[in-house]
Amino acid sequence: MHARLGRQILAMAALAMGAAALFATATAQAQQFTMKISSPTVADATAEWAKVFKAGVEARSKGKIKVEYYPGSQLGQIPATVDGVAMGTIEMSIPAVGFLIGLEPRFQVFDAPGLFDSMVHGEKVLGDPDIRKRFADLGAGKGIEPLTIFINGPQMIVSHKAIHGPADFRDQKIRVPGAAPMYVEPFRKLGASPLSIPLGEVLPALQNHTIDGAVAAIAVLTAFKYYDIAKPMTYLPGTFLVAAGIVNRAWMKSLGPELEAIVREESIKAESVYSNWGVDDAKRAADTWQQKGGQVITMAPDQAKQYLADVTSVMPPILAANPQVKADHDALVAAAKKYR
């Protein structure tokens, strides 16, 4: 009798252990990850990318990954969210690349003037397999990497005084999207005083005349209604705002191979919005600006040529200061020629 009772107890223990193992496996398989995405912009191509990305990831992961998108700097200003990704408190942030140089100086290369002819041309260059591979590990030493690098839109300058050519920049205090020489020196060459200011702080600075003008993507300026503060907005020749969606590398690995692959694949799929929806949105933004009483200025050909000559003239010493950035720039120039 005692032997039979012992066998029953052992059998029950084995069943319990098996059930516990099954429960642990099921729990691991059902584990849900939350991917918080921070963006400083609203109602632009970044938001459209996030919408497509969210739908694809949540559907393919069968609910194992929940994507939460926070536009308009809801999770904090750009420097704080970039630090948050590096520390692992935020899974993803999508700033202009100029705000990532503190983590990885190579990010500045994307903002070299004259690289891209149009948004579509720029997306072809950034989507080139060799270019993707070259920049896949940017920031790895600081625990981040770019999940997506894209053209947010044409770079514009909104200003209290209309900008029709290089001479109009002289003595103007201009907000630029980054503090590195790549952003600062071109405007110094034009006689301006460039200041790096996070996007969330630019509107009040322009309103109270702390700055005379601000450089940003066209859709951003329209979405935040800058036309209520300053009417003239000028296309900067051969210049586009490049942004990057950086993710925490440790978090990506924590997903496991299958879910990590889903995130990467859906990010690339969603990039199609930049070449279609994003291009159309840039046109809509210009139309809206004019409808709201703003002025959209395109420099005359001779002025545009002089502008590019001035701003590109400062590039050689900047590139020479960092051999890796110089090599990256050469690779982008070669890819740009390939897709012309």
Regions found by a protein language model. Give the residues of each.
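N-terminal secretory/targeting leader peptides
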Residues: 31-122, 130-340
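Intrinsically disordered, low-complexity segments enriched in small/polar residues
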Residues: 4, 16-19, 61, 291-292
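Boundary at the C-terminal end of the N-terminal hydrophobic targeting segment
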Residues: 23-24, 28-32
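Bacterial N-terminal signal peptides
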Residues: 11-24
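An acidic, glycine-rich surface segment that forms the CoA-thioester-binding/catalytic face
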Residues: 126
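N-terminal secretory signal peptides that target proteins for export/translocation
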Residues: 1-7
